[in-house]
């Protein structure tokens, strides 16, 4: 992907991949589309041999289901593919709990910077579609008053 050539040319301390890192929506048990998307991206990354760390979180397309939430029955298999692709170590907390949310703390010019990666897929309840999509004040999805529903799993 040409964008990665531009990114590689920069002098970066860290690069954040904030989701939709691959496009592999899958409904088949074997997640072939998602596997193929990760394989293709791995080839891109291997060619570039990045010389800076990359941290990542997923969104719907690397989760495996367009606009998916907690209802996606293949989310744990998708998570395994994500962890494997990003080479997340076995002692990382993400390997032992639901979801991929995490934080990193980086020191930069004498200051600590905390970066939070929110998993807005694993725990998210179904969205309530608008009754009049496109109308002013009727965005694609509207708030739902049930406070027991979650996005972050708490």
Q: Can you say where each PLM-predicted feature lies in the sequence?
A:
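Metal-dependent phosphoester/phosphodiester hydrolase catalytic core
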Residues: 1-154
């Amino acid at each position: 992907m040409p964008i990665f050539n531009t990114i590689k040319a920069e002098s970066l301390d860290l690069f954040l991949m904030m989701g939709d890192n691959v496009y592999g929506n899958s409904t088949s048990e074997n997640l072939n589309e998602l596997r193929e998307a990760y394989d293709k991206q791995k080839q891109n990354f291997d060619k570039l041999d990045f010389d800076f760390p990359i941290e990542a979180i997923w969104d719907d397309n690397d989760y495996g289901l367009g606009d998916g939430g907690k209802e996606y029955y293949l989310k744990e298999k998708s998570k395994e593919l994500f962890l494997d692709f990003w080479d997340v170590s076995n002692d990382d907390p993400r390997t032992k709990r639901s979801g991929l949310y995490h934080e990193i703390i980086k020191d930069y010019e004498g200051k600590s910077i905390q970066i939070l990666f929110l998993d807005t897929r694993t725990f998210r309840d179904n969205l309530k579609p608008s009754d009049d999509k496109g109308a002013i004040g009727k965005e694609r999805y509207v708030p739902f008053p049930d406070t027991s529903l979650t996005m972050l799993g708490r």
